[in-house]
Amino acid sequence: MVAGVIALSVVVGAPVLAAADNAITIPVMSQQDGAWAGAALGSSPTETIGSAGCAITAVAMMLRYDGIDTDPARFNAWLTGNGGYAFDDQLIWGAVTTYTGGRVAFSGWLGPDLGLIQAELDAERPVVAEVQLGGNQHFVLLTGDSSGGGFTINDPWFGDSVRFSDRYGDPSTGILSIRTFMPAAPPAPRRGDRDGWLASAVAAVRLAQ
């Protein structure tokens, strides 16, 4: 997590280009949004969502994409009241499964496996990635591929969508670890429902003749 305020000049060099063609479209959320930035992160006496809420903000973006109506403030409040943090403000990743009632399940805490990341993105499952920002632990949401090559990200600290390499360098060294999540598959239609629909359709055609 990004602890404390980091001067933007630490990581901002040349202007970054907006994420492009093959990225999953996920609206960006900023951990520094005034609607929640000042809220205490978990039960921490010092950290706030704005200073260290990158992980929950990245997860909140992913959950919104998967149809869960949430934001960093609501997610943080639930985690705080339901044992979703360790050591005051460290996200327990498996709590995501409980929070969503199993609609989105935490499926892995893994090393920087670029092949797995690509497979997840190809399956339209965004990936939470651990990086370093100004010497501090930070989390971003990998959303797809850029037309210029490499991964695209939604970055909670900056509240923008950019190419990973423009901000954090080569993914093979810039990604320290990943967290993966599996949305529940929508229920398949029951055979009876399908047969009933077909019967109704046939009857409608006959009536129209």
Q: What residues fall within each predicted segment?
A:
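Active-site-adjacent substructure of cysteine-protease-like catalytic cores
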Residues: 44, 108-152
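Active-site signature of cysteine proteases
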Residues: 132-209
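Extracytoplasmic/secreted proteins, especially bacterial periplasmic and envelope-associated proteins
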Residues: 53, 57-61, 74, 91-95, ...
